[in-house]
């Protein structure tokens, strides 16, 4: 049983790592995130890690929510993640996801 869970986890990580995407990113506030490096994505598994790249900067954040539900946007970042990426003043930016 333990081995099959481990193999499933590896396969899930590998599948999510292969899902490169380009599109728009925005950020959202709220007390629910407690200053964490988190994000919302429509399809990636909860708890998976996403690498977000913007203008030479890159961050890793954990998927803990669903969204964004605005056409053209591929990810919503927590305030801390947006600040680390350097996109706070722009609000919405074009990013690459890995």
Predicted regions and their residues:
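Secreted/periplasmic proteins
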Residues: 2-98
């Amino acid at each position: 049983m333990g081995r099959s869970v481990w193999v499933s986890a590896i396969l899930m990580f590998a599948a999510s790592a292969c899902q490169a995407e380009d599109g728009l990113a925005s950020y959202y506030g709220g007390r629910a995130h407690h200053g964490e490096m988190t994000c919302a994505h429509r399809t990636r598994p909860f708890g998976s890690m996403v690498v977000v790249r913007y203008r030479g900067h890159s961050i890793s954040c954990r998927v803990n929510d669903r969204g964004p539900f605005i056409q053209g946007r591929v990810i919503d970042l927590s305030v801390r993640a947006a600040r680390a990426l350097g996109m706070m003043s722009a609000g919405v930016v074009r990013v690459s996801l890995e």
